[in-house]
């Protein structure tokens, strides 16, 4: 999965989001690799109106069943072996309203990366018969305020299976975010449950994460 859209080489702002919040872990200000911490209780998302502006995104790293972690490398979201020197990508999850939401499928959420500057998106490219997973330059907090028709390709149902989570596209039911059994391959989507694809993930909360000031709504 790679960046799409105009100005894909966008540069991140130099300022960090300074919103006060409890610090239950330490971060190296120099940006040293993060070490995944122990599994914590799974977050509970609620159906929330997209007009709510004071809702803070949940922050976590994502790990698959093969002990791989998702990282962002040169605009590509890939799964690599979870080593101490690897810095996982920090995902920002925000509850999203959906008129046709099904409680059986899970909680609808939006997923952002790169400090909330890019969002995960599942849709079909022109001429393609199957959807693909992409990163689009959409600010997470602004996306949350858009109409449902514009948000739908960005919405994923988060279903909890014990301590694991599955992410199903709201725009393309039956298609789940997946990783390959091989290392260093792009994250994608699949509609097939097979041994060579992992669709269940562990979400490990991050206590404090950077986010561009422009992403914070008053």
Curated annotation (Swiss-Prot):
SUPFAM superfamilies for this protein: Cytokine (SSF50353)
Tissue specificity as recorded in UniProt: In general, low constitutive expression, if any, in healthy tissues; high expression in inflammatory counterparts, including in synovial tissues from individuals with active rheumatoid arthritis. Isoform A, isoform B and isoform C are expressed in testis, colon, placenta, lung and lymph node. Isoform D and isoform E were found only in testis and bone marrow. Whereas only isoform A is found in brain, only isoform B in kidney and only isoform C in heart.
PTM entry text: Proteolytically converted to the mature form by CASP1.
Lineage top rank: taxon: Eukaryota
Induction remark: Highly induced by bacterial lipopolysaccharides (LPS) and TGFB1, more moderately by IFNG, IL18, IL1B, TNF and the dinucleotide CpG (at protein level). Constitutive expression in bone marrow macrophages is down-regulated in the presence of IL4 and CSF2. Induced by phorbol myristate acetate (PMA) in different cell lines.
UniProt cross-references to Pfam families, sorted A to Z: IL1
A GO term for molecular function: identical protein binding
GO cellular component, as recorded: cytosol; extracellular region; extracellular space; intracellular membrane-bounded organelle; nucleoplasm
Locations listed in the record: Cytoplasm, Cytosol; Nucleus; Secreted
Entry keywords, A to Z: Cytokine, Cytoplasm, Disease variant, Nucleus, Secreted
Entry's family note: Belongs to the IL-1 family.
Functional summary from the UniProt entry: Immune regulatory cytokine that acts as a suppressor of innate inflammatory and immune responses involved in curbing excessive inflammation. Signaling can occur via two mechanisms, intracellularly through nuclear translocation with SMAD3 and extracellularly after secretion and binding to its receptor composed of IL18R1 and IL18RAP. Suppresses, or reduces, pro-inflammatory cytokine production, including IL1A and IL6, as well as CCL12, CSF1, CSF2, CXCL13, IL1B, IL23A and IL1RN, but spares anti-inflammatory cytokines. Inhibits dendritic cell activation.
PANTHER family in UniProt: INTERLEUKIN-1 FAMILY MEMBER (PTHR10078), INTERLEUKIN-37 (PTHR10078:SF31)
Assembly and binders: Interacts with SMAD3. Binds IL18R1, but not to IL1R1, with lower affinity than IL18, and does not seem to act as a receptor antagonist for IL18. Interacts with cargo receptor TMED10; the interaction mediates the translocation from the cytoplasm into the ERGIC (endoplasmic reticulum-Golgi intermediate compartment) and thereby secretion.
Name of the molecule in the record: Interleukin-37
Organism (species): Homo sapiens (Human)
Species classification: Eukaryota, Metazoa, Chordata, Craniata, Vertebrata
Primary gene name: IL37
């Amino acid at each position: 999965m790679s960046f799409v859209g105009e100005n894909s080489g966008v540069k991140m702002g130099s300022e960090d989001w300074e919103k006060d919040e409890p610090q239950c872990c330490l971060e190296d200000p120099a940006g040293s690799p993060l070490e995944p911490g122990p599994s914590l209780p799974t977050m509970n998302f609620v159906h929330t109106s997209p007009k709510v502006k004071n809702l803070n995104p949940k922050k976590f790293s994502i790990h698959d069943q093969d002990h791989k972690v998702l990282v962002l490398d040169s605009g590509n979201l890939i799964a690599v072996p979870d080593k101490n020197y690897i810095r996982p990508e920090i995902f920002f999850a925000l509850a999203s309203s959906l008129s046709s939401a099904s409680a059986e499928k899970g909680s609808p959420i939006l997923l952002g990366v790169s400090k909330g500057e890019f969002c995960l998106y599942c849709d079909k490219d022109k001429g393609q018969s199957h959807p693909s997973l992409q990163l689009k330059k959409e600010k997470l907090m602004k996306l949350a305020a858009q109409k449902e028709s514009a948000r739908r390709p960005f919405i994923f149902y988060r279903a909890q299976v014990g301590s694991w989570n599955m992410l199903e596209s709201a725009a393309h039911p039956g298609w789940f975010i997946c990783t390959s059994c091989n290392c260093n391959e792009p994250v994608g989507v699949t509609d097939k449950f097979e041994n060579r694809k992992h669709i269940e993930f562990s979400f490990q909360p991050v206590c404090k994460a950077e986010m561009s000031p422009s992403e914070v709504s008053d």
